């Protein structure tokens, strides 16, 4: 008997179009003899589009602004065995949709409310990973009211870290709002930008040498496995929004061109982070590797990484011998497992 799957795509974050591309890939890959898949696109305005508008959005990559607020149908998820919430960033990967589906009592692919929310929030992620002893670059927290009332205190925290440093909104994806700050004179503009997007901001030290950006995929629930390690190479100062989403700006290397013992360290730390953050189903864990010193720093954990056939996460597991179709099938199976 076929399993009925509700595939959610689009969403209100800056990764709306990436989600639509991922959804097209997943729709084509789920075996039709095993699954009956119904896609629903959520517009950038948060409207849940009816079937005809959903199909148009998937075909064109552009969603309409209309549609009904079909929360009652999604919450009931009547007749569906599981939901695949293929949504990235705020209002999709941050525990919000996971809470809705949990209230509805419907199984879904990926981390639950806690794992999704904590992994999306850079402050909470760093605090949990600190407590688990997982290495990260030095960082400080600042909140908007502090910046408005006692800006010198925030500037002092930046001075403690030294320059250059990064300024990052705590709860946004796609590298949106991130600035590289080379001197104290550049700090105020970067903080103003970040605080315009989030009430909490992370100040993050830079490594003394430009690090290599390496990534590993995790698959599983309580007994997860790690993929081979991949590497991203690019000319930009950091992996910003433009580099991330402009074709040809970054190159993917699988396996990463690093010593085997470093790859094993990365895989071990990624599994530790996955468990510490109470993730489930899947995650892509990103690290900085400083070749000159041998240091390794965890950068972030993505609980719903990009999922086109050319995205890093599926490619990592393809290198492990798992085809794209087998991977998405396994994710649905994991969603249906009792946790």
Swiss-Prot record:
One of its GO terms (molecular function) is ATP binding. Binds 2 magnesium or manganese ions per subunit. Its main location: cytoplasm. Mg(2+) 1 binds at residues 286, 300. Coiled coil: none annotated. It catalyses: 2 D-alanine + ATP = D-alanyl-D-alanine + ADP + phosphate + H(+). SUPFAM superfamilies: Glutathione synthetase ATP-binding domain-like, PreATP-grasp domain. Cell wall formation. This is D-alanine--D-alanine ligase.
């Amino acid at each position: 008997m076929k399993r009925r799957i509700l595939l959610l795509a689009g969403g209100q974050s800056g990764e709306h179009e990436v989600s639509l591309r991922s959804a097209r890939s997943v729709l084509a890959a789920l075996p039709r003899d095993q699954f009956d898949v119904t896609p629903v696109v959520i517009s950038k305005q948060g409207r849940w589009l009816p079937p005809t508008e959903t199909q148009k959005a998937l075909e064109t990559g552009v969603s309409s602004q209309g549609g009904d607020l079909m929360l009652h149908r999604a919450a009931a998820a009547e007749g569906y065995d599981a939901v695949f919430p293929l949504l990235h960033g705020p209002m999709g990967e941050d525990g919000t949709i996971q809470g809705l589906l949990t209230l509805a009592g419907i199984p879904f692919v990926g981390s639950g409310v806690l794992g999704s929310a904590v992994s999306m929030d850079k402050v909470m992620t760093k605090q949990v990973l600190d407590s688990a002893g997982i290495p990260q670059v030095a960082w400080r927290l600042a909140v908007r009211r502090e910046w408005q009332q006692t800006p010198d205190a925030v500037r002092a925290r930046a001075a403690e870290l030294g320059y250059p440093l990064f300024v990052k909104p705590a709860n946004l994806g796609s590298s949106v709002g991130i600035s590289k700050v080379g001197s104290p004179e550049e700090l105020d503009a970067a903080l103003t930008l970040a605080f315009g997007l989030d009430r909490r901001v992370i100040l993050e030290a830079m490594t003394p040498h430009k690090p290599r950006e390496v990534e590993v995929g995790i698959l599983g629930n309580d007994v997860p496995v790690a993929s081979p390690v991949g590497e991203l190479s690019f000319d930009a100062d950091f992996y910003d929004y433009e580099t991330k989403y402009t074709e040809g700006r970054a190159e993917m290397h699988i396996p990463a061109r690093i010593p085997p013992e470093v790859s094993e360290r990365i895989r071990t730390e990624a599994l530790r982070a996955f468990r510490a953050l109470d993730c489930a189903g899947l995650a892509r864990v990103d690290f900085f590797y400083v070749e000159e010193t041998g240091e390794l720093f965890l950068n972030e954990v993505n609980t719903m990484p990009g999922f086109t056939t050319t995205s890093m996460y599926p490619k990592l597991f393809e290198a492990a011998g798992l085809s794209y179709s087998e991977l998405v099938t396994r994710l649905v199976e994991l969603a249906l497992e009792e946790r």
